[in-house]
A protein has these predicted regions:
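C-terminal motif of bacterial Sec signal peptides marking the signal peptidase cleavage site
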Residues: 18-22
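Thiol-based oxidoreductase modules, predominantly thioredoxin-like and allied folds used
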Residues: 64-68, 86, 110-127
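N-terminal leader/targeting and pre-domain segments
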Residues: 24-81, 170-172
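Stable alpha-helical elements in mature extracytoplasmic
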Residues: 93, 97-100, 128, 161, ...
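Solvent-exposed loop/turn segments at secondary-structure junctions
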Residues: 89-93, 119-122, 150-152
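Bacterial N-terminal signal peptides that target proteins for export
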Residues: 1-10
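Non-catalytic, surface beta->alpha helical segment in thiol-disulfide oxidoreductase systems
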Residues: 138-172
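Local sequence-structure signature of Cys/Sec-based thiol-disulfide redox active-site neighborhoods
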Residues: 69-113
Length: 172
């Protein structure tokens, strides 16, 4: 979603000066270009402010989860029948997903504890890489239901919504 928005913004930003200069005299084009630049800066500041708010919210939500480490994940020390969330604060998709997860979980009064594995250092921490491989995690955010029979169910938002998925896994 963010990729589409960024592409659309890029196209608009690139084509706006062309259309403005084609429709006005040179002095008006200069004024329009200045206005366009100010608008771009304003939009950029709004995006930065939005990202800062999401980062703060991410940190607050993660505090309500049970933070875990890769060793506990690899050694099956997490209580089955709960959720395991792979993510990191620097991931824009994780920052967008986490408030939705928290809100949906609260709305459905899910009985699950949510374990959180911070994948920030996955590129240099082999244990985190192994934990991700164990559950076939290729990217974040990833949410997994740890079945009581030692299996697992991965949320795939291309196939089901988070509320639908909660309804499915609450039947296990």
């Amino acid at each position: 979603m963010k990729c589409i928005r960024m592409s659309l913004c890029f196209i608009i930003i690139c084509t706006t000066p062309f259309f403005l200069s084609a429709c006005t005299s040179s002095s008006q084009a200069s004024e329009s270009s200045t206005i366009s630049s100010v608008s771009q800066v304003s939009t950029s500041e709004n995006e930065v402010e939005h990202d800062l708010k999401l980062t703060k919210l991410y940190k607050e939500i993660v505090k309500s989860f049970q933070e875990t480490n890769a060793e506990d994940v690899l050694n099956n020390k997490l209580v089955k029948g709960n959720l395991l969330y792979f993510g990191r604060e620097t991931c824009p998709f994780c920052r967008e997903f986490l408030p939705v997860l928290k809100e949906t979980s609260d709305l459905y009064h899910t009985p699950f504890k949510i374990y959180y594995l911070n994948t920030e250092d996955s590129h240099k921490n082999s244990q985190i890489k192994k934990a991700m491989e164990k559950y076939n995690v290729t990217g974040v955010p990833t949410l997994i239901y740890l079945k009581k029979d030692n299996g697992f169910e991965v949320l795939n938002e291309e196939q089901t919504t988070l509320p639908e998925w909660f309804n499915i896994i609450m039947k296990y």
